């Protein structure tokens, strides 16, 4: 963001030119010349308790997702900040809760993407508890609008559309591209077997990005999509796949132009 670079991972200390930053556990900022921590636990250690897997920025707000189960904001324990939290430049805060002081998500966050006030989150979670209301359709991907969580569609039977973990999210306009190791998307009761590892949510429905010509997904091999980036109508996809549909040489990275 500007000249600031935010970094997350499994590190437990940052050494800034000879000065140990013990509060820079798992997340830190580089301003072009020096490292700094994002807050502390009030006792010179970091605010986060475990690894950070993803970071997204909107204005001055930094959204962090990972495996941490708690955030300590200057000595105050935020038990609702499980797996995802927001840093506003001064303080940490949670994104909602389960209505009982715990976090809304029940497992790790691997991907965050932001569009306006909407924060899209993907990961290994199988449920989102929105202030006491269980969102059983919010499996592996969900949206936070600043005040409440919601699911992206369902399987038509109150469960989620995706079958397993989401590792990547990218947004273009109203389209949300989601990648992971899921092998099927169920769009309100309609199975989309060609939506293997990557799919698009247009705000109303899920759809596949092409196919192998036989009704299966375009991406094959020992497959997982780890990264997605969008430029205009082009969608770039990276992962461990060894084939990209009609492009057999598309190992590990491929481009979808909207039709091929």
What would you call each of these model-derived segments?
Residues 1-260:
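Extracytoplasmic surface signature
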């Amino acid at each position: 963001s500007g000249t600031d670079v935010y970094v997350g991972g499994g590190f437990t200390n940052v050494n800034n030119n000879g000065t140990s930053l013990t509060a820079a556990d798992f997340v830190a900022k580089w301003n072009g010349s020096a490292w700094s921590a994002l807050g502390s636990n009030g006792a010179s250690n970091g605010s986060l308790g475990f690894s950070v897997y993803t970071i997204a920025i909107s204005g001055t707000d930094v959204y962090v997702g990972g495996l941490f189960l708690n955030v300590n904001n200057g000595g105050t324990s935020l038990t609702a900040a499980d797996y995802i939290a927001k840093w506003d430049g001064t303080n940490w805060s949670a994104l909602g809760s389960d209505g009982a002081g715990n976090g809304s998500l029940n497992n790790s966050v691997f991907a965050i993407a932001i569009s306006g006030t909407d924060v899209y989150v993907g990961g290994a979670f199988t449920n989102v508890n929105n202030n006491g209301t269980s969102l059983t359709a919010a499996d592996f991907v969900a949206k936070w609008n600043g005040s409440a969580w919601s699911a992206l569609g369902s399987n038509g039977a109150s469960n989620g559309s995706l079958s397993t973990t989401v590792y990547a999210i990218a947004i273009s306009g109203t389209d949300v591209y989601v990648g992971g190791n899921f092998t099927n998307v169920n769009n309100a009761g309609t199975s989309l077997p060609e939506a293997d590892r990557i799919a698009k949510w247009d705000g109303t429905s899920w759809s596949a990005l092409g196919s192998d010509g036989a009704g299966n997904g375009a991406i094959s091999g020992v497959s997982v999509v780890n990264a997605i980036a969008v430029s205009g109508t082009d969608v770039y996809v990276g992962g461990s796949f060894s084939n990209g549909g009609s492009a057999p040489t598309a190992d590990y990275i491929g481009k979808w132009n909207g039709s091929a």
